[in-house]
Amino acid sequence: MRLTVVSVIAFFISTPVFAQDSGAIGFGTVAEAYAALRKDAKAEFLIQEGWVVAKVTEGPHSGVWSFTPNTHPAHPAVIKRFPAEIGGQIAIRMQALCGGPKPACDQLVEHFKKLNEQVARDIQQRKGGK
């Protein structure tokens, strides 16, 4: 998922805020989310280390959607990350929808929280270097 961090840096510019809210992701199942994004003309899909990543730059599905590979312990699962204004600053919001076992889903969410924190550190380092 290292490539995801690099590509997400270009998409998000701020301190991360974490919110796991599977109801707010807008779909009842991971399969429904995937099917809807496949129909979205604004969705750009790529495969990164077995993960299906959909980048949607505008519209109701706006954000970066990361779908677990079939071999992932939390599969089927999707993590949606998107920018949101919180307290006057742009932050990374995150929503998860996971059909796998709870412990694996919890680990998946923690993994993405760490990725978000790394993005924030990378951005702060870039700001400090200017």
Sequence positions of predicted segments:
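Positively charged n-region of N-terminal signal peptides that target proteins for export
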Residues: 1-4
